[in-house]
Curated annotation (Swiss-Prot):
Single Gene Ontology BP annotation: deoxyribonucleotide biosynthetic process
Protein name: Vitamin B12-dependent ribonucleoside-diphosphate reductase
Enzyme class, first EC level, given as a word: oxidoreductase
Species of provenance: Mycobacterium tuberculosis (strain ATCC 25618 / H37Rv)
KO phenotype (gene knockout): No visible phenotype, even under low-oxygen growth conditions, nor in aerosol-infected B6D2/F1 mice.
Signal sequence residues: none
Length: 706
């Protein structure tokens, strides 16, 4: 074998350089020939079989390039030539791995072809499946009418059209810059911006908060507005706190009120009906103030029946006064919102225990820290914030909207280090993109457009934190990870502020600037610039981990196009192949376990760098959320995962710690506490961890579509 390799290397040195100028891809497009791509493919195959000859990949790549000759080389011919040259060199093990890789890629292309999708972005099959069902435009026969790259181009062009309002003729230049970010998956906006750009719907904002006042007219008018928004793919959040309690007098009829929980059920049913004909499952948030007389019914609304309110996340709006009363075992007042009168007093600790027991049982309700939120309200003169969007990352005033986007941190690496310059550049362009979204989006009701333009709130966040940490070999549950996450979010927020100030110089400050807490500082284009969403489907499209969440499993099966396909975390897959310990049997065993911690067959540093959400202590979940929140103007959507053995006291401790850590909201999820959870490790016999088509690795318990 060594003699064959030496003769092969010597033979290749004598061949003259006459390489192809172009490569014809399978879709017929031409791209420049790049010998480095051949060398990289051979290097990956060599690493998997522990072939450590550093010169071999370059030698093989040169031999392939020489053999192809001048002109245009079809990609299949290039790959055939790689196989042949590996065989001639006696590198049978490397050739076998390369052949298997080709076969798997061919199977993936076949599956995508069956879906009728052209995918020049080389996305995962799960991503392509979701895009086909809900994002891509279709022709009259229901077939996809655009490719994955054309979807990104459509969104970029639509959003960049806003640029011509400020600098005529500049939209084409900015469309190209926006498209580069989207095609490279360095940044993606919330789903409606991808779905609805350039369509008749035209609604690009992700979520809205709608007001509900204490009258049937308001209740049903808001319900109608919510249906219209949900039909277009928008999520809705509500404060039910202004509705009179159950049993209260209704003067106009002489009857009694049914209370906020009854109308909450009505809203949930409507969301289910609307979503059946829409592009996304309805997702809503209901917040009820802790002082409302019906708070106990609200707290137990989902705990008593897991199938209740499937389209709603529930959060109790708690105040500092209530939580201080809990700490000192004081009394808590319940106040009728119609009259403003105290109707009852109860031990604060008793109510808090009921909240914690319900969350322990099924994940709801979470907490929204109203005083913490309103201390950071950028425009307090416009009102007190009482509700959030469905996932809790954006507290909003009535009729305000979320215009969200996330930087893919996994794409912010270069040569094994964070590319800080690129991170700041992407953040600056992303702020401009999101500001443009406000201008080009259509708003079904005038109040929505007026509220969006008055404060021009945007929410630039992140996804892929867990993948970035794993790629750097940093355990998620470590001081180093918390420090890096803090530094990342600080740099993003600083870059976002700089970009917003520059936009204010070009376009003017947001109209409500003089009434804002920034009035004495320099002008800003946006009242709010940062927010960390769970990212839902967009992290699936980007092929990375959700928001700032840990990985939910290292290997799992996903139901796609009628089959269950084994998926492996891409970062773990690369590491395992690079270090030569990748084996199909190993991956199948990991899939049965879900995670790799405590798995003795892997190196200790690998086990440490790839924790799953269920393997991380709750305190580390909260520490990460709190660290990121310190450099986020809106809020951070994050689930604190608890083991199945967690107690109600554990939930209580996390909720109190979250308040003291000054996060703006908190959600817990105890493993196994909800029927039909997406991810399952425990079974009477080994069972592969499973995910449905659209699960992206975020919260296993609460609803998130955004």
């Amino acid at each position: 074998m060594p003699g064959e390799r030496r003769r092969f290397a010597q033979a290749t040195k004598s061949v003259g350089v006459s390489w192809p100028a172009k490569v014809r891809r399978r879709d017929g497009t031409l791209v420049p020939f790049d010998i480095a791509r051949i060398e990289a493919a051979v290097t990956r195959a060599a690493r998997e079989v522990a072939c450590d000859d550093p010169d071999m990949p370059g030698t093989v790549a040169k031999a392939v390039a020489d053999a192809l000759g001048r002109g245009i080389a079809p990609v299949e011919d290039i790959q055939d030539c790689v196989e042949a040259r590996l065989g001639e060199a006696g590198l049978d093990d490397v050739a076998r791995v390369y052949i298997i890789y080709r076969q798997r890629r061919a199977e993936l292309r076949t599956a995508k072809a069956l879906l009728g999708v052209r995918d020049e972005l080389k996305l995962s099959l799960a991503a392509v499946t979701v895009l086909r069902e809900r994002y891509l435009l279709h022709d009259e026969q229901g077939r996809p009418a655009e490719s994955t790259g054309e979807l990104m181009d459509r969104s970029a062009r639509c959003v960049a059209a806003a640029e011509d309002q400020y600098e005529p003729g500049s939209s084409r230049r900015w469309a190209e810059r926006f498209a580069t970010l989207l095609r490279n998956l360095e940044f993606l906006p919330n789903s409606p911006t991808l779905m609805n750009s350039g369509t008749d719907l035209g609604l690009l904002a992700g979520c809205f908060v709608l007001p509900i006042e204490d009258s049937l007219q308001s209740i049903f008018a808001t319900l109608g507005q919510a249906a219209e928004l949900q039909r277009a793919g928008g999520g809705t959040g509500y404060a039910f706190s202004h509705l009179r309690p159950a049993g209260d007098r209704v003067a106009s009829t002489g009857g009694t009120a049914s209370g906020p929980v009854s109308f909450l059920r009505l809203y949930d049913s409507a969301a289910g009906v609307v979503s059946m004909g829409g592009r996304r499952r309805g997702a809503c948030m209901a917040v009820l103030d802790v002082s409302h007389p019906d708070i106990c019914d609200f707290v137990t609304a989902k705990a008593e029946s897991p199938s209740e309110l499937p389209h709603f996340n529930l959060s109790v709006g708690v105040t500092d006064a209530f939580l201080r009363a809990v700490e000192r075992n004081g009394l808590h007042r319940l106040v009728n919102p119609r009259t403003g009168k105290i109707v009852a007093r109860m031990p604060a600790a008793e109510l808090f225990d009921a909240i914690c027991k319900a969350a322990h049982a099924g994940g709801d309700p979470g907490l929204v820290f109203l005083d913490t939120i309103n201390r950071a309200n950028p425009v307090p003169g416009r009102g007190r914030i009482e509700a959030t969007n469905p996932c809790g990352e954006v507290p909003l005033l009535p009729y305000e909207s979320c215009n969200l986007g996330s930087i893919n941190l996994a794409r912010m690496l270069a040569d094994g280090r964070v590319d800080w310059d690129r991170l700041e550049e992407v953040a600056g362009v992303a702020v401009r993109f999101l500001d443009d979204v406000i201008d080009v989006s259509r708003y079904p009701f005038p109040e929505l457009g007026e509220a969006a333009r008055a404060t021009r709130k945007i929410g630039l966040g992140v996804m892929g934190l867990a993948e970035l940490l794993a790629a750097l070999g940093i355990p998620y549950d470590s001081e180093e990870a918390v420090r890096l996450a803090t530094r990342l979010m600080r740099r993003i927020q600083q870059a976002a502020h700089t970009a917003s100030r520059r936009l204010a110089e070009e376009r003017g400050a947001f109209p409500a600037f003089t009434d804002s807490r920034f009035a004495r500082s320099g002008p800003r284009r946006n009242a709010q610039v940062t927010s960390v969403a769970p990212t839902g489907t967009i992290s699936l499209i980007a092929g990375t981990t959700a928001g700032i969440e840990p990985m939910f499993a290292i290997a799992f099966t996903r139901a796609i196009v009628g089959r269950h396909l084994l998926e492996v975390n891409p970062c773990f897959d690369r590491l395992a192949r690079d270090r030569g310990f990748y084996r199909d049997e190993l991956i199948a065993e990991i899939a049965q376990r879900g995670g790799v911690r405590g798995y003795p067959r892997l190196p200790a540093e690998v086990r440490a760098a790839f924790p799953t959400a269920a393997e991380i202590a709750p305190q580390w979940h909260l520490r990460m959320q709190a660290a990121v929140q310190r450099h986020v103007e809106a809020a951070v959507s994050k689930t604190v995962n608890l083991p199945a053995t967690a107690t109600v006291d554990d939930v209580r401790a996390i909720y109190v710690a979250a308040w003291k850590a000054k996060v703006k909201g908190i959600t817990v999820y105890r493993y196994g506490s909800r029927e039909g959870q997406v991810l399952s490790y425990a079974a009477p016999k080994p069972l592969l961890a499973q995910a449905d088509t659209e699960f992206s690795g975020g919260c296993a318990g609460r609803s998130c579509e955004f």
